[in-house]
């Protein structure tokens, strides 16, 4: 606590006292010694602000700048008032060193010549500030504020779209929205604060004119001085005061201009200048040649121009050497890669008897390599890391590391996902373009190349960046190429989670659980071999049921499994699903805990329950003829499709006897319908029946007669 109080009194209290001093300096008379100190502080303080602006990486990193601009402006005006009071009060007895120094040493002359020089310098400073720096900075601040505020809604919608697509996490979405708010606050404040700078320039002219006129009145009328002497004294001091006031103001104007003209480039101003001025050696050679041509012309300063030409040529030579080194390094890298490939090809005889396959891999055409190029941001790599974390949280499955391979046999703009070396999905991208997906109500078509979203098969359009905002406004969901692959990867992991979960993964789950729940693990491993545990977990994942609640799953297996290994896997899966019933219900229920369900007609349900059989790999199936399958599936579609169009995503609710077999029937026909049993529905869930699946009685009777 002591440390916190100390920090408070050395920062917040100091700032508060400083602001009060600034305000009171306007009305409280100051001794000349204090005035000198404050003027020197004002000069160095504005210089520090300028240096801070030059070294920040982006404008919002210096978010206190608008407040500092106001404080510095008021402080400078307070010093103007105090110095005017002292000059008019003391006249030629004024002993302020800072103003005297600027009125004599900085001006570079004395007498009438010094006045003319000082007045000229003062006018030039005023003109530069008023018509060049301040006017430009004010205009840029206005435009930046307007565009920032106009695009806030669009940026927020884009962030929401990426979050809903699973591309970014909730924390990343919040941070991006906070950054948008910071930018809006900063540029909105700068729009108003820039008016302080322009107003400061105008008031400087006014104060100078008033000081000269008031000085002549005081000197000639009240002090009985001669007109020439009064003009010399007060004009000299006024110009010194004006120059001393305008120099900090000029520094502040330059800082304002710099901070509102900074682009989105990363790095400080100096780093950006160095990087962008060192891209081409040819520029410096051309500049050197131009200087040599000027040097040989009559009347030009030959030695200075030749010296500058040599300097430019030297810089060009250094850049050319660096370019050659980069080219050599690049060639060496390519040679090393080729040599490595040759060594790989030549060393096949030394390879072991087994070449393991990657559990999950992403192969890219060479045109998509920039997406994983670390020198260009490698945005896709960071997204993949987030996806693996989300898979662990959503499904309870720790996805394996994803190997990324450049496949020269792929189309340059294509990519594909493989699990254990077998392709499971592929897509095609256009780098530099955005995919506008018709995910909802679209009010207007946008120009572009018509295509299909590779993840969900929705109609989409490839659009240019200039049409991105328009597409978002009319209802499209717009995603970047890296986000497309990331979303596709998320879907691949979800739909193929059962194939990704190997026995080694299951053993890792068991080992991790043993550390905190050794009794549960010992009980289940005594009754269930590793292979059966794997099949149960795969059965859950195959139907998108999270296995994160591993303790509940293992306890259920321990309760219902048998050491004689006689309990079939489908039975164990049903028992585990019943234990996880509330979790499954929440997965499909709406916000009011209402589960929208389809039911089977009782006669159809009875008929199907008599058709259950187990395959050799322990899958529960329905032994129906092709005609019977067709009629059952058509009856389900008749209820499911209209209900889906009304906005519901219903599940099929049936008995636990045929639940698994019905899901396998849908899966074999690529119908994505969740199937639950009555025993899985928790007591606090409300069930709303949206339709009954039935077949005409004559058809059911025909089925029975065939038996």
Swiss-Prot record:
Residues 341-350 have a biased composition (Polar residues). The chain crosses the membrane at residues 8-28, 34-54, 62-82, 114-134, 202-222, 239-259, 290-310. Its main location: membrane. InterPro entries: FHIPEP_1 (IPR042194), FHIPEP_3 (IPR042193), FHIPEP_4 (IPR042196), FlhA (IPR006301), T3SS_FHIPEP (IPR001712). GO terms for biological process: bacterial-type flagellum assembly; protein secretion. The keyword Transport applies. It is a multi-pass membrane protein. The keyword Phosphoprotein does not apply. Keywords: Bacterial flagellum biogenesis, Bacterial flagellum protein export, Cell membrane, Membrane, Protein transport, Transmembrane, Transmembrane helix, Transport. It is found in: Cell membrane. One of its GO terms (cellular component) is plasma membrane. Residues 329-350 are annotated as: Disordered. Residues 329-340 have a biased composition (Basic and acidic residues). PANTHER family: FLAGELLAR BIOSYNTHESIS PROTEIN FLHA-RELATED, FLAGELLAR EXPORT PROTEIN, MEMBRANE FLHA SUBUNIT-RELATED. Belongs to the FHIPEP (flagella/HR/invasion proteins export pore) family. Involved in the export of flagellum proteins. This is Flagellar biosynthesis protein FlhA. The lineage of its organism: Bacteria, Pseudomonadati, Spirochaetota, Spirochaetia, Spirochaetales.
């Amino acid at each position: 606590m002591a440390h916190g109080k100390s920090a408070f009194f050395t920062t917040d209290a100091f700032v508060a006292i400083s602001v009060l001093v600034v305000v009171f300096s306007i009305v409280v008379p100051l001794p000349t010694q204090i005035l000198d100190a404050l003027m020197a502080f004002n000069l160095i303080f504005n210089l520090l602000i300028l240096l801070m602006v030059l070294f920040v990486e982006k404008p919002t990193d210096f978010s206190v700048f608008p407040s500092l601009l106001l404080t510095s402006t008021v402080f400078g005006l307070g010093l103007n008032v105090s110095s005017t009071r002292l000059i008019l009060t003391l006249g030629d007895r004024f002993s302020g060193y800072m103003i005297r120094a600027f009125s004599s040493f900085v001006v570079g002359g004395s007498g009438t010549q010094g006045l003319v020089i000082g007045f000229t310098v003062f006018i030039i400073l005023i003109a530069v500030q008023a018509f060049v720096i301040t006017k430009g900075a004010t205009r840029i601040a206005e435009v930046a504020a307007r565009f920032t505020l106009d695009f806030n809604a669009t940026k927020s919608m884009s962030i929401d779209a990426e979050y809903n697509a699973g591309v970014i996490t909730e924390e990343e979405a919040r941070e991006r929205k906070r950054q948008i708010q910071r930018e809006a606050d900063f540029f909105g404040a700068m729009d108003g604060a820039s008016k302080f700078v322009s107003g400061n320039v105008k008031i400087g002219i006014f104060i100078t004119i008033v000081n000269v006129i008031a000085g002549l009145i005081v000197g000639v009328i009240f002090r009985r001085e001669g007109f020439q002497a009064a003009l010399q004294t007060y004009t000299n001091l006024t110009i010194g005061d004006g120059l001393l006031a305008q120099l900090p103001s000029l520094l502040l104007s330059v800082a304002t201009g710099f901070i509102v003209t900074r682009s989105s480039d990363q790095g400080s101003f100096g780093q950006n200048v160095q990087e962008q001025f060192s891209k081409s050696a040819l520029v410096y050679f051309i500049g050197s040649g131009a200087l040599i041509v000027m040097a040989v012309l009559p009347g030009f300063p030959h030695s200075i121009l030749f010296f500058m030409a040599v300097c430019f040529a030297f810089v060009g030579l250094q850049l050319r050497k660096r370019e050659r080194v980069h080219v050599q390094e690049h060639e060496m890298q390519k040679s090393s890669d080729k040599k490595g490939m040759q060594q790989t090809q030549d060393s096949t005889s030394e390879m072991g008897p087994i070449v393991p396959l990657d559990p999950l891999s992403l192969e890219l055409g060479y045109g998509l390599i920039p997406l994983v190029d670390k020198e260009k941001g490698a945005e896709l790599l960071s997204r993949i890391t987030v996806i693996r974390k989300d898979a662990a949280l959503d499904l309870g499955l720790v996805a394996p590391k994803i190997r990324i391979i450049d496949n020269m046999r792929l189309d340059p703009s294509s990519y594909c996902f493989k699990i254990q070396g077998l392709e499971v999905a592929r897509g095609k991208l256009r780098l530099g373009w955005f995919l506008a997906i018709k995910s909802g109500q679209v009010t207007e078509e946008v120009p572009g190349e018509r295509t299909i979203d590779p993840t969900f098969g929705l109609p989409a359009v490839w659009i240019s960046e200039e049409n991105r905002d328009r597409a978002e406004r009319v209802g499209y969901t717009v995603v970047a190429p890296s986000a497309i692959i990331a979303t596709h990867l998320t879907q691949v992991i979800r739909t193929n989670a059962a194939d990704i979960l190997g026995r080694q993964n299951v053993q890792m789950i068991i080992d991790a659980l043993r550390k905190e729940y050794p009794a549960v693990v010992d009980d289940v491993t005594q009754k269930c071999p590793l292979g059966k545990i794997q099949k149960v977990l795969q059965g859950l994942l195959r139907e998108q049921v999270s296995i994160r609640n591993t303790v509940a799953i293992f306890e259920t297996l321990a309760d219902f499994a048998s050491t004689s290994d006689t309990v079939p896997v489908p039975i164990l899966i049903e028992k585990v699903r019943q234990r996880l019933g509330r979790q499954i219900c929440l997965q499909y229920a709406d916000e009011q805990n209402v589960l929208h369900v389809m039911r089977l007609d009782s006669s159809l349900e009875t008929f199907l329950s008599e058709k259950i059989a187990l395959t050799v790999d322990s899958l529960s199936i329905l032994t129906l003829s092709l005609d019977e399958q067709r009629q059952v599936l058509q009856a389900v579609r008749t209820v499911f499709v209209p209900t889906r169009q009304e906005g519901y995503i219903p599940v099929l609710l049936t008995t636990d006897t045929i639940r698994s077999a019905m899901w396998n029937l849908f899966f074999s026909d690529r119908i994505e319908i969740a199937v639950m049993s009555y025993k899985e529905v928790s007591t606090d869930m409300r069930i709303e029946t949206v339709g009954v699946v039935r077949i005409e009685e004559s058809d059911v009777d025909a089925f029975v007669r065939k038996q």
